[in-house]
């Protein structure tokens, strides 16, 4: 018969192409696919490729008006997940023309926007993305870079120290500023607004900005060191967010902060551009990440969110600790720490990295470690993460029995002792506790902290683990 032949056909006929050779300009994705019973893995992988690119559930006559071969996503490989029944890694290649330049928002809308509710799948997780260099070059990326930040702050050869002010909600602006001053005076480099401190009735943003600026200038004058406080510019509208960043710049402070997932990628990229143009560092908090990345079989791994943040822009990003109260397995965590900091990262499945990633000189991001860490963790943190990290002790500073400033002193002394010992060639993994004990002999503040936290443990198994073959 004459005319157009409609009807439903299997996705794999069009979108499963195991013979396809990926191009340097393709965006590559690794999905963990759990098909519904009876759905072959090839069909499930092809369905993901189709529904996240050009496909729909039926053949449509307008398919004939374009070159689907040029624009379609392709599932080019399927492999079973070791040790898991009915789970597969599906590799999908997307042509670069499907994505708007310089837009993380558009990239995610395409790749993960719709397909996760697809009925043929029981669950779906985006494990990793390979961002091609041609696409990276359309992004500004982080406002400054690790070396530029060190030059701005005049701090070299050690991790930076921070502290989140607690209680996170309820303090007046003046008392909040006082807590900031005590911590900075004691020896910290930074203090931090909590992620949910925006502009509430008990403390409006402008009052907080003013008292925090006063605190850090007073601490700078007394210590002779450059200090910063992460002023949270996150707001209900982009215009209000930029207004807060402008006020921070007018106060002359070095750094502002944004909650990039709750605030959204469009807002975050706008703020990153403002920060580069106006010499502000940008601290990024990942509030809401566990809603997206916590489940092992569904959602999106944090390494993808970390790559997206590096494209969108931020000078610091929270990235798990390996020790402390927030989950993070060592190899996996170090994998996405490298993705934040380094210029070139090789494929390494033992660390969860599915693709080689070349950042072509896009500035790096300082990973921030926080959550249930204290002075006894300092040797491990210094050894695991090296110099290019921010170590953030909230309760581990403010919970000191003598107060905020002594808590800050204890952390700074512990850090300096660990860095000195490491530079002398001592093994922090073996001698860490001894190094801290030695330092505490001439620092009563550190001795009190050691006594206070000697029994604190967070003994839970990590949720985010590597796949291992069943024995």
From Swiss-Prot:
GO terms for molecular function: magnesium ion binding; monooxygenase activity; ribulose-bisphosphate carboxylase activity. Belongs to the RuBisCO large chain family. Type I subfamily. GO terms for biological process: photorespiration; reductive pentose-phosphate cycle. PROSITE patterns: RUBISCO_LARGE (PS00157). The disulfide bond which can form in the large chain dimeric partners within the hexadecamer appears to be associated with oxidative stress and protein turnover. The basic functional RuBisCO is composed of a large chain homodimer in a 'head-to-tail' conformation. In form I RuBisCO this homodimer is arranged in a barrel-like tetramer with the small subunits forming a tetrameric 'cap' on each end of the 'barrel'. Binds 1 Mg(2+) ion per subunit. InterPro entries: RuBisCO, RuBisCo_large_chain_AS, RuBisCO_lsu_C, RuBisCO_lsu_C_sf, RuBisCO_lsu_fd_N, RuBisCO_lsu_N_sf, RuBisCO_lsuI. Its cofactor is Mg(2+). Mg(2+) binds at residues 192, 194-195. It is found in: Plastid, Chloroplast. SUPFAM superfamilies: RuBisCo, C-terminal domain, RuBisCO, large subunit, small (N-terminal) domain. The record marks 325 as: Transition state stabilizer. The modification N6-carboxylysine is found at residue 192. Keywords: Calvin cycle, Carbon dioxide fixation, Chloroplast, Disulfide bond, Lyase, Magnesium, Metal-binding, Methylation, Monooxygenase, Oxidoreductase, Photorespiration, Photosynthesis, Plastid. Heterohexadecamer of 8 large chains and 8 small chains; disulfide-linked. The disulfide link is formed within the large subunit homodimers. PANTHER family: RIBULOSE BISPHOSPHATE CARBOXYLASE, RIBULOSE BISPHOSPHATE CARBOXYLASE LARGE CHAIN. CDD domains: RuBisCO_large_I (cd08212). One of its GO terms (cellular component) is chloroplast. This is Ribulose bisphosphate carboxylase large chain. The modification N6,N6,N6-trimethyllysine is found at residue 5. NCBIfam families: PRK04208.1.
């Amino acid at each position: 018969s004459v005319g157009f032949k409609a009807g439903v056909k299997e996705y794999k006929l069009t979108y499963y192409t195991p013979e396809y050779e990926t191009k340097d300009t393709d965006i590559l994705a690794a999905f963990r696919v759990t098909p519904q019973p009876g759905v072959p893995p090839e069909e499930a992988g092809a369905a993901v490729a189709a529904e996240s690119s050009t496909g729909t559930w039926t053949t449509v006559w307008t398919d004939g008006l374009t070159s689907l071969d040029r624009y379609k996503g392709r599932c080019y490989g399927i492999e079973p997940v070791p040790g898991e029944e009915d789970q597969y890694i599906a590799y999908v290649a997307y042509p670069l023309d499907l994505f708007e330049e310089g837009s993380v928002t558009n990239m995610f809308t395409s790749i993960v926007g719709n397909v996760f509710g697809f009925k043929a799948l029981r669950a779906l997780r985006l494990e990793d993305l390979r961002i091609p260099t041609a696409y990276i070059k359309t992004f500004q990326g982080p406002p400054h870079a690790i070396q530029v930040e060190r030059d701005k702050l005049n701090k070299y050869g050690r991790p930076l120290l921070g502290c989140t002010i607690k209680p996170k909600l309820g303090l007046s602006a003046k008392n909040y500023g006082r807590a900031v001053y005590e911590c900075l005076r004691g020896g910290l480099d930074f203090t931090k607004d909590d992620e949910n401190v925006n502009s509430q009735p008990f403390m409006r943003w402008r009052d907080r900005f003013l008292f925090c600026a006063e605190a850090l200038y007073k601490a700078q004058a007394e210590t002779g060191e450059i200090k910063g406080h992460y002023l949270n510019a996150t707001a209900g509208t982009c215009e209000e967010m930029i207004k807060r960043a402008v006020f921070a710049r007018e106060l002359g402070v070095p750094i502002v902060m944004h909650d990039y997932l709750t605030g959204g990628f469009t807002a975050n990229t706008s703020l990153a551009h403002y920060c580069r143009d106006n010499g502000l560092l940008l601290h990024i908090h990942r509030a809401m990440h566990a809603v997206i990345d916590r489940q092992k079989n569904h959602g999106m791994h944090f390494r993808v969110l970390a790559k997206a943040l590096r494209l969108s822009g931020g000078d610091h990003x929270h990235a798990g600790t390996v020790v402390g109260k927030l989950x993070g397995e060592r190899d996996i965590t170090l994998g996405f720490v490298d993705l934040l900091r380094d210029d070139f990262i090789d494929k390494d499945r033992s660390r969860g990295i599915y693709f080689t990633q070349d950042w072509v000189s896009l500035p790096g991001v300082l990973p921030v470690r926080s959550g249930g860490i204290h002075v006894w963790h300092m040797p491990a943190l210094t050894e695991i993460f090296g110099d290019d990290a921010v170590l953030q002790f909230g309760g581990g500073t403010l919970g000191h029995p003598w107060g905020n400033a002594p808590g800050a002193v204890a952390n700074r002394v512990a850090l300096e002792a660990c860095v000195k010992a490491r530079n002398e060639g001592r093994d922090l993994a073996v001698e860490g506790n001894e190094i801290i004990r030695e330092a505490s002999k001439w620092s009563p503040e550190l001795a009190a902290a050691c006594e206070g936290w000697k029994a604190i443990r967070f003994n839970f198994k990590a949720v985010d683990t590597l796949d291992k073959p069943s024995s």
